[in-house]
């Protein structure tokens, strides 16, 4: 199925690209999320008319993400306190929601979906966590897990 992308999508393309995707991906994700429209003649003409507006919107979103990334870069290590055993092993774990809540409490609003962690944190110590604020903008935050 041919679609026109209205946003930059990782491993697929950028704004205005006409790409072929599987029908289910288009119908169930791209079109309902407003990230693409079907590539019909009418939609192509409409897109060409709105291209400058969409590019400005995309640039504004990226600028806002870069501003948030600068604020994240200024943060000192974010401290998360959790119950732990004598050897530093946590009772439970710290996931993306806990990290996002701690960063938001430190003064920069971050959503759970923006936090990128390979695994949950299960031990005390210092970790580097990547926060993906935009398709092109990433920031690294120091997270320090301490025992209560």
Curated annotation (Swiss-Prot):
Keywords on this record?
Answer: Ribonucleoprotein, Ribosomal protein, RNA-binding, rRNA-binding
Q: Which SUPFAM superfamilies does the annotation name?
A: L9 N-domain-like, Ribosomal protein L9 C-domain
Recorded superkingdom: Bacteria
The record's listing under Pfam families reads: Ribosomal_L9_C, Ribosomal_L9_N
Q: For this UniProt entry, which segments traverse the membrane? A: none
Biological-process GO terms, alphabetical = translation
Q: Which GO terms describe its cellular component?
A: ribonucleoprotein complex; ribosome
Gene Ontology MF term list: rRNA binding; structural constituent of ribosome
Q: Which Gene3D superfamilies match?
A: Ribosomal protein L9, C-terminal domain (3.10.430.100), Ribosomal protein L9, N-terminal domain (3.40.5.10)
The record, for InterPro entries, names: Ribosomal_bL9, Ribosomal_bL9/RNase_H1_N, Ribosomal_bL9_bac/chp, Ribosomal_bL9_C, Ribosomal_bL9_C_sf, Ribosomal_bL9_N, Ribosomal_bL9_N_sf
Family from the record = Belongs to the bacterial ribosomal protein bL9 family.
NCBIfam families in alphabetical order = L9
This molecule's function is given as: Binds to the 23S rRNA.
Spell out the protein name for this chain.
Large ribosomal subunit protein bL9
Query: Which species is this record about?
Result: Aeromonas salmonicida (strain A449)
